[in-house]
């Protein structure tokens, strides 16, 4: 039996979230989606993390940056892929050692980065 990897996509743009879901299912991930920051924070606060958390930096309610800070304090930031259309924000987080992609990203880049994160 194949060990399926899991991903939580926290993205307020529902069309983009659905596209990410399809792209991740194509490479064998089970996908959970959340569409606002507060729900994302609640889901990640008490649960065991999925293999990968794909986190939009600009969310309604609680920002992706705040959620990332919480995960970083818990030492769980290596499982996170930060996503933003803001190139400077992505570069800033990359310089700090975070996994970050500018969106929209090419499908193969997205799949490659997520697979690397899931592999540890």
What residue spans do the PLM features occupy?
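Active-site residues of response regulator receiver
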Residues: 56
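Short amphipathic alpha-helix used as the core "switch/output" element in two-component signaling
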Residues: 65-77
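Two-component/phosphorelay signaling modules centered on CheY-like receiver
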Residues: 14-32
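Two-component His->Asp phosphorelay active-site signatures
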Residues: 13, 86
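A Lys-centered signature of the CheY-like receiver
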Residues: 103-104
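Acidic, metal-coordinating helix/loop segments flanking the phosphotransfer/catalytic sites
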Residues: 33-52
